[in-house]
Amino acid sequence: MELSQLLNEIRANYEQLLTRNQIETVLSTRIQLEEDITKKMDKDGEALKAAQAELKEARRQCHHLQVEIESLHAVERGLENSLQASEQHYQMQLQDLESVIGRLERELQEVRRGIERQLREHEMLLNTKMRLEQEIATYRRLLEQEEIRYYGCIQGEKKEEKPTKSKVGFLLPSAIINEISFSTKVSQKYENENMETVTKQAVVNRDVKESAEAHGTIQTEKVDEVIKEWEGSFFKDNPRLRKKSVSLRFDLHLAATDEGCLESRQDNLPDIEVRLIMRRSCSIPSIKPPPGTN
């Protein structure tokens, strides 16, 4: 009785211990689970906060990027508009330049045609000038030949009448012809030989002109005598003139006559034309007459 009661008591205590242990185990397990859950919740909460902060930062960055993208789009649109405006502007300038180039090319062609036309006209004028110069030279040569033939015939006729006669005349400027007086002498030596020598000396305001010229046609064999006579007449007619203050130059050349005038004189020497030029020397002054003398 006592044993069964003891067993019952032991069984009851054991059951109580089991129940107590179970309860403690369950409680400890629950507490551990609650602690783990709490820790996990705390950790997850921190992670959630970090994720929320990251999300907020990402949203802020996304908004900033959106604003920047919009500004870039605006800049892009502005650049596109500026590009279109620049293209239109330069297209207009290009059209203007093309029109200017076309106009300048047309003007250049006109200038080239004008230059070619002027060159042709210049060539024509030059050819005309050359032809006119040739014609003028031809006419001048013909006139000189006719003049030489005419004077040759006249001189031939005079020489046939007075073959030993020589005439000399001075050529003076027309502007001072009214102020010039002449003195004339006839050489007795050549009068005896039937030869007349007319000497004219130019005197301006009682002084010999700076230059004077005489020419005449004489027989060839009388050249030396006539030249000496002419030279002496310059100083003989004006004693106040020194020979050192005057230089005399003699140019001799054959007188041109036509063939008809020379037919009758083939046996004689041809006449020559003598030209005497008197020039005052610049280094030696002449002696001027005292005032009041004639």
UniProtKB/Swiss-Prot annotation:
Keywords: Coiled coil, Intermediate filament, Keratin. This is Keratin-like protein KRT222. Residues 1-150 form the IF rod domain. Residues 1-151 form a coiled coil. One of its GO terms (molecular function) is structural molecule activity. SUPFAM superfamilies: Intermediate filament protein, coiled coil region. Gene3D superfamilies: 1.20.5.170, Single helix bin. PROSITE patterns: IF_ROD_1, IF_ROD_2. GO terms for cellular component: intermediate filament. Belongs to the intermediate filament family. The gene is Krt222.
